[in-house]
């Protein structure tokens, strides 16, 4: 049975009976065979029995939790079965060595900028202001300078959104709370992507807490933030363009009663359905010479980092080629 992501938008409870997980809510009880679960996204209020947690942990299922506003609040990250002392040591070495860390951070920023430019090109927009930020990368002597170049590129990138989007006005980036519908979708989509990246890291030898562009923190898996930078334009932003310009998401899918503008429950259902379809979408991989899903591209990026840390192959960032 092919494993898939489950998005639980409504409030409910997860229980276990034998080797099946059940999701119970006011609409009834829904069985979820354990061997069909890749990851769970809890977008509503969710309670879980200890027996359910035990089975999910045994099967290596990550559970990602979001608050009522759609913001990521944490993950249940099962005990790692692929842990490698050598890889963790090499990860730590590359973080502690300022030159090695700067090399990886620069690669993440370069990949993010090139992907933003590629997305603009696909949308028939001028990418020259975004590309101009690349010239600052080679001379950057610190993480702060690299993040400044990335921020400049992203600001230039965002100025094109109002030319791409037909039915909503973007203006500028705003967070917590989002000031308009587009910002609400960006924040929600980025949270989903961060969680998807974390799920892929779990299935590799990488330690999710050791990062290079973003500063490690006690309360976040910052390597997922590093890798997510590469995929935000390709997965989240292109999805938003598609949803808006095809009239799939409309003003009725948002709620302004909670302060700011947020996706309603129905809006979240639409978004996660299409987000998951985007993860499952396939492209022909140039090096592997076969079709791989967007979700698999994230895993492959993790493997590239493992190869870099173990001196098998120097890391180069994912850049959209199609």
From Swiss-Prot:
Broad enzyme group: hydrolase
Alphabetical UniProt keywords: Antiviral defense, DNA-binding, Endonuclease, Hydrolase, Magnesium, Manganese, Metal-binding, Nuclease
EC number of this enzyme: 3.1.-.-
Presence of the UniProt keyword Magnesium in the record: yes
One GO MF term attached to the UniProt entry: DNA binding
One GO term (biological process): maintenance of CRISPR repeat elements
Protein role: CRISPR (clustered regularly interspaced short palindromic repeat), is an adaptive immune system that provides protection against mobile genetic elements (viruses, transposable elements and conjugative plasmids). CRISPR clusters contain spacers, sequences complementary to antecedent mobile elements, and target invading nucleic acids. CRISPR clusters are transcribed and processed into CRISPR RNA (crRNA). Acts as a dsDNA endonuclease. Involved in the integration of spacer DNA into the CRISPR cassette.
Record note on quaternary structure: Homodimer, forms a heterotetramer with a Cas2 homodimer.
Protein name: CRISPR-associated endonuclease Cas1 2
Organism listed in the record: Archaeoglobus fulgidus (strain ATCC 49558 / DSM 4304 / JCM 9628 / NBRC 100126 / VC-16)
Taxonomic classification: Archaea, Methanobacteriati, Methanobacteriota, Archaeoglobi, Archaeoglobales
